Design a protein with these regions (language model features):
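Conserved beta-strand
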Residues: 9-12, 19-29, 60
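Helix-to-loop junction immediately C-terminal to a conserved catalytic motif
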Residues: 52
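ABC-family P-loop ATPase nucleotide-binding domains
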Residues: 84-140
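Helix N-cap at the start of a conserved alpha-helix in ABC-type nucleotide-binding domains
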Residues: 164-166
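Conserved ABC transporter NBD signature motif
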Residues: 60-71, 75-76
Length: 238
């Protein structure tokens, strides 16, 4: 697929009563990690869900490798790893059973890689998911997202509930994921310093509107994500 954008969002809009995701555009090239920042309720999760077709958008277009998700849907969906929360499996299951379900869904499921990630993350394959900590459930969802041949990961707060050591480990996994220059990641993180470490570009969304898209280098030179966001919210120009 050469240098074609892995994902391209053009003028995506979603209207709810009392909230509007307004005309958001971004593009993710092979080898890139693009981060979303903004206050709770800014529209980051809405953007991800609309991009994936989980909710219907009111306007705009989303392309994966130049194609709408509706075309060749199964083929494209097999190449997308998604984590929007940590509750993707029935909590009465264990990790081994979750892996068997994934093997039946994804044609490129890698059982050996899955077991490697479970061991790396310290996940007991036989322990019921209902007995996991929140951090362990997050790690399980990440393991499944990383093991089915995905070429783009779309991740909403994937490090939520993790201790600093586990966060660092998983951030390194994301960088490793894109290191071949072919894959990509769209990610939101509540700890902006983590995003500055791994993202190539950062998109700031405030009250449903896209304020800017800038490189991490630019943002760090201007004082960091938190400083820029706070100045904007206080009414200063970006």
């Amino acid at each position: 697929m050469g240098n074609m954008d892995v994902m391209k969002i053009e003028n995506l809009t979603k209207q709810y009563k009392g909230f509007r995701l307004d005309n958001v555009s971004l593009r993710i090239k092979p080898g890139e990690i693009v981060g979303l920042v903004g206050e709770n309720g800014a529209g980051k999760s809405t953007l991800m869900k609309a991009a994936l077709g989980l909710i219907r958008s009111d306007a705009g277009q989303v392309l994966f490798w130049g194609q709408p998700l509706q075309q060749n849907s199964v083929e494209i969906k097999n190449k997308i790893g998604v984590m929007l929360d940590e509750s993707g499996f029935y909590h009465t299951m264990n990790a081994q059973e979750a892996g068997k379900i994934c093997a039946g869904i994804y044609k490129d499921w890698d059982s050996a890689k899955y077991e490697t990630f479970l061991n790396k993350y310290g996940i007991n394959m036989k322990k019921p998911i209902k007995d996991y900590s929140k951090g362990m459930r997050v790690k399980l969802m990440l393991a499944t997202a990383l093991c089915h041949g995905a070429e783009i990961l779309i991740l909403d707060e994937p490090t939520s509930g993790l201790d600093p050591v586990a966060r660092e480990e998983i951030l390194e996994d994301f960088k490793e994921f894109v290191s071949d220059g072919k894959k990509a990641v769209l990610i939101s993180l509540h700890i902006s310093s983590d995003l500055e470490k791994i993202a190539d570009e950062i998109v700031f969304i405030h009250q449903g509107r896209q304020v800017f898209t800038k490189s991490s280098r630019e943002i760090c030179e201007e004082g960091g994500v938190d400083m820029i966001m706070n100045e904007y919210v206080r009414g200063k120009s970006i």
